[in-house]
Amino acid sequence: MSTLKADTIQSTSGGAATLTKQVAAKTWSNTNAAGTTINGSFNVSTLTDTGTGIQTIAYTSAMANAIYSATISMASDAANHEWLDSQATTGIAAKHYTGSAYADVATMWQIIGDLA
């Protein structure tokens, strides 16, 4: 058995290695729904607060089509409902409902699919 140890992996031209023939998150983000704060992200250009409990992220690099896997996790402590809405090649929206009203909560996003 061989062991590969490396600090940097580059393409043959010396640039960054591209993710091909792999299933890896093409977008991830940790956002604060009470405003437009992005705590950390990859391939996210903006966060739009479109209303209480509703937020939309825009991708820096578009997806190849609107058929991709999107998951969210929202910070809440009750029997709440979260769902994704308006899935497009350029971004996606998430909504959070407490059972009686929409509420702003921190949201963690992960998008898997092909980039354009």
In which residue ranges do the predicted regions lie?
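Intrinsic low-complexity, repeat-rich intrinsically disordered segments enriched
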Residues: 1-39
